[in-house]
Amino acid sequence: MANNFFYTIVDILFNTMHIFAILINCFGWAFKKTLRINLLFLLITISSWSILGLFYGVGFCFLTMLHSLSLDFFGPTSFPFSYLDYIILEKLNINTSSNIISLTSIFFVFSALAISLKRNFITKDKTIIWLLWISCICWLIIVNEKGIGFVPDPTNIFIFLTLLASFALIGKIFHQLLRKDF
């Protein structure tokens, strides 16, 4: 019974952290006080999905991994690769596909990043906007075809160019931040 109690507490704690991160990612741009944290969370999210995704699978989230490992401490679980799959499909029991959830998530994160960039600073470097939409569209195509959780094959030219666009996007935004252009 104690394990069940602690399992529930840990699950609630990680659910709270995940929901907080999702809300900041999607709506942090709407409030002046959360503009910078929104941009930071979005950059961390996209970096995790793509950079860490090279090693752990496209769409990888370190918070989801920690959530899964923490719950596994209390006994084996079948935690899905995506937190949104966990909450929407398993906890809320909503009848939809994992692929629809992933595609919607990609669209919302990149759209929120576009809004956040506009609200945080106005850049003369249109390359960032082009890289943002190229990354978004390419990830939508890749995830629609392959899903998430697969380790990308860098010899696939489309995946390679998508990763390159994402890395360039992240780098250019960080460069703007370091130059204090925002």
Give each language-model segment a name.
Residues 2, 54-59, 140-151:
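Juxtamembrane "helix-exit" motif on the non-cytosolic side of transmembrane helices
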Residues 2-22:
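Hydrophobic transmembrane alpha-helical segments in integral membrane proteins
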Residues 10-12, 63-65, 149-161:
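Non-cytosolic membrane-interface motifs at loop->transmembrane helix junctions
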Residues 11, 86-117:
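Individual transmembrane alpha-helix segments
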Residues 28-39, 117-126, 179-182:
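Membrane-interface helix-boundary motifs at transmembrane edges
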Residues 43-68, 136:
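Hydrophobic alpha-helical membrane-insertion segments
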Residues 60-98:
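Extracytosolic (periplasmic/ER-lumenal) interhelical loops and adjacent juxtamembrane/interface segments
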